[in-house]
Amino acid sequence: MIIKSIKESYPSVFLSIDTYHATVASKTVAAGVDMVNDISAGDMDANMLSTVATLNVPFIAMHMQGTPDTMQDKPTYNNIAKEVVDYFIQKTAACKAAGITDIIIDPGFGFGKTINHNFQLLKQMEVFQLFQVPVLAGLSRKSTVWKTLHITPE
């Protein structure tokens, strides 16, 4: 398996698996992955939170409105920062209740958000400090960047 090869060749490398399937998380952590990054924060697999707790690895919980198939179908928010904070209030509580001790939150730039939503969130990143956990902000190769600069993603 590629994960074992990477860990053998580069033992100090910290690997993350991007998945919303608990079985994938379990198998890849067993192979040497160090962290689970779930775009649904456990919403797409009822076993994810308990699995990550059992695995005892850091968990990146991302906010996404909708699913990967529907997230860009007219995303709507009344107050995006408040709604994402409210989501993480519930989600971090669920993670802690499941036994996850190392939580990282990701506001989910580009996942169920318009360019305007992304900029509103970016301007209010300090609101996430109330959780006292690391915040991951994935901005690379997002349409927010290339559309604002009037260039192509290439």
Residue locations for each model-derived region?
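Conserved Motif II region of HX4D acyltransferases
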Residues: 108
